[in-house]
Design a protein with these regions (language model features):
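Alpha-helical oligomerization segments with coiled-coil/rod-like character
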Residues: 1-64
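Short glycine/threonine/proline-enriched tight-turn/helix- or strand-capping micro-motif at secondary-structure
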Residues: 53-67, 81-114, 182
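Small beta-strand-rich domains/subdomains or short beta-sheet motifs embedded
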Residues: 72, 105, 111-115, 144-145, ...
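Generic structural motif
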Residues: 73-81, 110-120, 161
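A residue-level detector for short acidic-glycine micro-motifs
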Residues: 81, 106, 122, 146-149, ...
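Short aromatic-glycine-enriched beta-strand elements
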Residues: 89-92, 97-100, 127-134, 174-176
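Zn2+-dependent peptidoglycan hydrolase active-site motif and core
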Residues: 114-149
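Conserved, short, structured surface segments that act as functional micro-motifs
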Residues: 133-136, 154-194
Length: 194
């Protein structure tokens, strides 16, 4: 009986600590998403029309769109967190922050590759995510986060399969956080990758 009470008390403490950690993580996720939306919105402004004017970008947009379900994975590893809303595996009533992408478990320093031809729009450093690279493909964007080294810089043209950086250990985990956006709307990456 005493053992059960001790276990319940420990679970309650863990839940409280986890909820505090989760609140901090939620703030990081929200900050990351706001920054992505800001960068994308700025990239897409074209004389008030919201469309990109350069023909090269529109060609990339069309080619990217045609490759839905056929893009290569940015790294070789298992998906450990999927797109969307999920609940904590132990505390079933606790919602995790909405995931606008997928998290892929990888060894430290594993290479991260561009999923399609594009232009590096920006490299952002975000708390909890380290270095993040945003690549533009017309009206589409791919986002590679939780990275250690960076092999590209803003303005660089990248090719499908080109290494854009490596994965770093953050919060004790070696994971790539990967997102795909169409304009300012996040897409489920698993529907785009083969």
């Amino acid at each position: 009986e005493l053992q059960s009470q001790t276990y319940v008390a420990q679970l309650k403490r863990n839940r409280s600590k986890y909820q505090k950690d989760l609140a901090a993580k939620k703030k990081q996720v929200e900050a990351l998403n706001r920054e992505i939306e800001r960068i994308i919105a700025a990239s897409m402004r074209g004389k008030g029309t919201g469309k990109i004017k350069q023909p090269v970008d529109m060609k990339l947009d069309s080619e990217f769109s045609k490759n839905k379900g056929r893009l290569p994975w940015p790294a070789d590893g298992p998906v450990v967190d999927h797109f969307g809303l999920h609940y904590h595996p132990v505390f079933k009533s606790v919602k995790l922050p909405f995931n606008n992408g997928v998290n892929i478990a990888l060894p430290k320093d594993a290479p991260v590759k561009a999923v399609f031809d594009g232009v590096v729009k920006q490299i952002v450093v975000m708390p909890g995510y380290n270095k993040c690279v945003l690549v533009q493909h017309g009206n589409y964007f791919s986002f590679y986060c939780k990275r250690g080294s960076t092999a590209v810089k803003p303005g660089d043209k990248v090719k499908t399969g080109q290494i854009v950086g490596t994965v770093d250990t953050i919060d004790g985990m070696n994971q790539l956080h990967f997102q795909i956006w169409k304009g300012t709307t996040p897409q489920n990456p698993e529907l785009w990758l083969r």
